[in-house]
């Protein structure tokens, strides 16, 4: 069962990545690059409003993993917890839908910069439907988290994959065969999220409460879990603000079409972090066990070995995308204009994301020791640097300014953070880690890919699939 859960977890993550890169070019092709900016803004808004979760999903998953019982009648506490959180989320969702509905005209007319050929009334209606879609997706995340920690990971990932297929294929079908309208896209998202929320909620309740025992709202449940949920909410607030500030400010300061280019560049730049998180899923449990056993020798060996493998994979992917950014963007979107506009932004965003990906190993080392305060402190410092930097660089340099700010902030803060954590817990191998796991892979991979780029010239006259194959061969050869 454990192996099956791991396989379906990987399938779920793989599908999320694959679907993103498959469907985005279709949306760009059907709707146009400027209208795609509304989808990019919807994604940003969804992540920002996830703060309204208030740490409830993290708290539910922790409580389920701690208290779930296979015995009949043994889950009364969890049923009351789920009912309490569910009713609280109902209030949160209604509030989100109401607020987005009211402020939609302000978003369209005062925040986003639409061109003259876009109908503001259609965009306002679309934003309102997307607000309803968000209102149902957030509680669905709560129910998904509950299923994952009940070890119903196969079912949870199947439901999530089917939901992803439904919301994307339904939108593509309606846009292609009926009417090319951002309103139609928004309605498809709303209906798909509503169905997914209702189905995954029903499945979670059946799993926790097969005997259909009546659960009730309990105030004491909130009182007993508020400290943990508040702490998680604060970490979430910092993380969300840090991750979305650049997109939010770009959407405010630049035309919608420019924001579309930035959104596409951001999508490409997340790949190194996804690669790193796959390593993190495997490494963190072993870190935690070795820290608990105070086995410093094996912890050091695992940190160096894992760090080297992570750097090898992350840097190969990152530097390949940097060297072939224009080629990759053209092969992905089929647009030479997108490739020209977004290539430099991709490179700068990749620098920042690569630094964060390489920091994942020290980050998990700190978590294994229960050392989380430094992450909060560095998050706050990052915001203090990033926010003013974004306003200055975007106003001065335009689209590329967002990438400059992101790269500089991570270069300053992330570098300091990882050195501090490694020095605190594994000081004896700090220099060796920097040389073996960072500098050596960075230099060797850069040289290899530079040589491969010289001997394998890829131009935009190639077919899209041929470009993908050439980039893939170059990256694989480096490994």
Stretches with model-predicted labels:
Residues 2, 182-186, 200-243, 286, ...:
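Interhelical loop/hinge segments that connect adjacent transmembrane helices in multipass membrane
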């Amino acid at each position: 069962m454990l192996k099956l859960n791991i396989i379906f977890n990987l399938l779920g993550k793989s599908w999320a990545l694959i679907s993103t890169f498959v469907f985005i070019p279709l949306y760009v092709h059907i709707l146009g690059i400027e209208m795609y900016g509304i989808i990019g803004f919807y994604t940003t808004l969804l992540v920002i409003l996830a703060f309204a979760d208030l740490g409830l999903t993290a708290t539910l998953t922790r409580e389920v993993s701690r208290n779930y019982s296979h015995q009949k009648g043994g889950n009364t506490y969890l049923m009351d917890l789920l009912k309490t959180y569910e009713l609280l989320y109902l209030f949160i969702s209604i509030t989100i839908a109401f607020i987005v509905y009211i402020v939609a005209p302000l978003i369209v007319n005062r925040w986003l910069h639409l061109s003259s050929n876009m109908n503001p009334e259609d965009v306002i209606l679309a934003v309102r439907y997307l607000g309803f879609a968000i209102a149902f997706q957030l509680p669905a995340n709560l129910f998904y988290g509950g299923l994952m920690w009940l070890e119903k990971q196969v079912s949870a990932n199947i439901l999530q994959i089917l939901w992803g297929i439904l919301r994307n294929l339904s939108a593509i079908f309606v846009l292609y065969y009926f009417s090319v309208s951002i309103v139609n896209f928004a309605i498809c998202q709303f209906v798909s999220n509503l169905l997914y929320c209702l189905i995954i909620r029903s499945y979670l309740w059946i799993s926790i409460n097969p005997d259909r025992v009546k659960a009730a709202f309990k105030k004491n449940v909130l009182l007993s879990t508020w400290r943990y949920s508040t702490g998680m909410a604060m970490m979430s607030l910092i993380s969300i603000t840090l991750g979305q500030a650049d997109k939010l400010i770009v959407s405010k300061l630049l035309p919608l079409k420019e924001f579309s280019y930035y959104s596409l560049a951001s999508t490409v730049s997340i790949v190194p972090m996804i690669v790193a998180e796959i390593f993190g899923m495997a490494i963190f449990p072993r870190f935690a066990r070795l820290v608990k056993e105070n086995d410093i020798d094996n912890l050091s060996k695992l940190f160096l070995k894992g760090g080297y493998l992570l750097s090898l994979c992350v840097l190969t992917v990152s530097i390949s995308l940097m060297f072939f950014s224009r080629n990759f963007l053209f092969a992905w979107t089929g647009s030479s204009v997108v490739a020209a506009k977004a290539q430099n932004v991709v490179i700068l965003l990749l620098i920042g994301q690569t630094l964060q990906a390489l920091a994942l190993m020290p980050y998990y080392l700190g978590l294994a020791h229960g050392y989380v305060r430094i992450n909060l402190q560095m998050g706050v410092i990052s915001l203090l640097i990033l926010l003013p930097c974004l306003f200055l660089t975007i106003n001065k340099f335009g689209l590329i300014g967002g990438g400059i700010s992101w790269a500089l902030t991570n270069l300053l803060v992330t570098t300091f953070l990882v050195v501090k954590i490694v020095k605190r817990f594994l000081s004896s191998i700090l220099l060796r880690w920097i040389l073996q796991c960072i500098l050596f892979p960075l230099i060797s991979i850069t040289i290899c890919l530079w040589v491969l780029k010289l001997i394998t010239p890829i131009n935009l006259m190639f077919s899209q699939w041929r470009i993908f194959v050439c980039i893939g061969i170059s990256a694989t050869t480096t490994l």
